[in-house]
């Protein structure tokens, strides 16, 4: 009998019934499955839990942050412009309201760089959600990086 209040993370794919010993094994299996479906080769996660996937012009970083229990997908868009920042920030917030689906624009304060990001709990993450997040981050970045650079100038 399973304890419904067991706080242990669940690393399993609901669609296939496959279970995994840890989050990295699960995400590596999802990366391999994604690569096979896309007809390409992708590197598995490195020792730090990172790999990169190219989607159109977007380079999507896949980060397994096991200590925090999350999957973080990040794709660089452009540096924050030196001028017109209020208008730029408003544009990013407006786009993040609906145009980015499950992703959002974010800014890395240390690098002063704009990213498209998606963050999900690792426990209970199934392949379809992984694929959807990867596709969404790639699509949003690919769609908006050139538009925003043209509109606000790339530094």
PLM feature spans:
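Short, internal acidic amphipathic alpha-helical interface segments
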Residues: 74-113
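Charge-rich, low-complexity N-terminal segments
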Residues: 1-61, 106
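Well-ordered alpha/beta subsegment
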Residues: 100-135, 139-155
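Long, highly charged amphipathic alpha-helices
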Residues: 26-29, 87, 91, 132-143
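Hydrophobic residues embedded in beta-strands of well-ordered beta-sheets
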Residues: 49-51, 69-71, 112-114
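A short local loop/turn or secondary-structure capping micro-motif enriched for an aromatic residue
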Residues: 69-70, 81-82, 123-126
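A short acidic-to-branched-hydrophobic micro-motif
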Residues: 61-79
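Secondary-structure transition/turn motif
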Residues: 54-58, 75-79, 118-122
